[in-house]
């Protein structure tokens, strides 16, 4: 595929996806935009968020100041945009990032399969997975996932191009959006363990920016490992929302809840009406094509290492005390979705059964996104 043809195709992917995202949710509510307030604080040379609305969850008070527990990269991405265009919303940036992610998925997957399959799987990613709702809604938790995906996908593209230092650097940037992603380093280590030169370059890149989080924590709370997440966790204990038990912040007893939500959580059926469950929905119902990437056995080498990387990230996510709160789908899937997409690309064939599963996935996500908008999620 020539450069100009690739450029035109990438532009068409970007334009098509961002148009769909904008059309399906033209008037978003634009609340829970924590990162926008944090970005404004960064531009003012401060780390606290004094102007954060009082009803916004996931914040904490420390020494008379209000802070957010989240890693800083999503706010750093927003900061220059807000500096140029003061009134830009987090959701407006989110749909742009979502469309960029679709382009990056295409560029990544065509390294593992034919262009036609890569294009079909790009449509699947953008419109048939939780990436659809995540990009469209753009609230704080989803914005972190969307931003992390940019860097995670860039890391995998750089890895495939043998740019190992950049690959490690991008993985750390992704981790400074969503901390569990750093466990994806398992994949890279297994892939490069017999190539010491490449592995060393990757490790140097991966570790170079890790101190950013430690310094950020120390400047806010006086300890390099103090993120504020534990305080937020304690604020949720005993809340009336969840029908599930309140176990520990990272607790092995949380694994069944996450596993069920990820795979099997069904929709709600009441008075003959089928609606998405606010607790999430399993990929069995809304993203069935992805099941192909989860069927063992995994071929020795790349497939097995991709699954190992997915498992390492998923394990930390599955230990978390909450399954993702109010959501369509299972948002934590986005932390390890790039690995599963590559496995899917390796196995995917443009046959009727695969196309049918793709169409079902896209239709289910259009249904779910429309309901989520209607329900005010």
Kindly give the residue locations of the regions a language model identified.
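Membrane-proximal envelope and lipid/glycan-remodeling enzymes
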Residues: 1-377
């Amino acid at each position: 595929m020539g450069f100009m043809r690739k450029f035109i195709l990438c532009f068409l992917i970007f334009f098509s996806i961002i148009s769909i995202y904008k059309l399906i949710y033209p008037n978003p509510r634009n609340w829970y935009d924590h990162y926008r307030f944090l970005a404004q604080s960064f531009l003012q040379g401060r780390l606290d968020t004094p102007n954060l609305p009082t009803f916004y969850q996931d914040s904490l008070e420390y020494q008379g100041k209000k802070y957010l527990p989240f890693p800083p990269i999503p706010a750093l991405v927003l900061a220059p945009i807000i500096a140029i265009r003061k009134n830009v919303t987090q959701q407006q940036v989110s749909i742009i990032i979502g469309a960029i992610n679709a382009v990056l998925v295409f560029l990544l997957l065509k390294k593992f399969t034919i262009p036609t399959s890569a294009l079909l799987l790009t449509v699947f990613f953008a419109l048939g997975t939780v990436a659809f709702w995540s990009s469209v809604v753009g609230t704080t938790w989803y914005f972190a996932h969307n931003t992390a995906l940019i860097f995670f996908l860039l890391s995998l593209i750089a890895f495939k191009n043998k740019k190992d230092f950049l690959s490690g650097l991008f993985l750390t940037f992704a981790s400074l959006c969503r901390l569990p992603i750093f466990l994806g380093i398992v994949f890279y280590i297994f892939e490069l363990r017999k190539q010491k030169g490449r592995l060393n370059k990757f490790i140097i890149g991966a570790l170079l920016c890790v101190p950013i989080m430690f310094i950020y924590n120390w400047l806010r709370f006086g300890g390099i490992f103090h993120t504020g997440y534990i305080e937020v966790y304690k604020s949720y204990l005993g809340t009336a929302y969840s029908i599930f038990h309140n176990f520990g912040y990272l607790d092995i007893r949380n694994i069944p809840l996450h596993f069920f939500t990820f795979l099997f959580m069904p929709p709600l059926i009441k008075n003959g009406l089928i609606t998405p469950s606010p607790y999430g929905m399993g990929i069995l119902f809304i993203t069935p094509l992805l099941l192909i990437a989860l069927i063992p056995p995994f071929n020795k080498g790349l497939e097995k290492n991709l699954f190992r990387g997915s498992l390492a990230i998923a394990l930390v996510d599955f230990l978390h005390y909450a399954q993702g709160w109010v959501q369509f789908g299972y948002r934590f899937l986005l932390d390890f979705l790039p690995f599963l997409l590559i496995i899917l690309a390796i196995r995917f064939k443009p046959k009727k059964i695969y196309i049918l599963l793709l169409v079902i996935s896209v239709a289910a996500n259009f249904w779910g996104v429309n309901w989520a908008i209607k329900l005010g999620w």
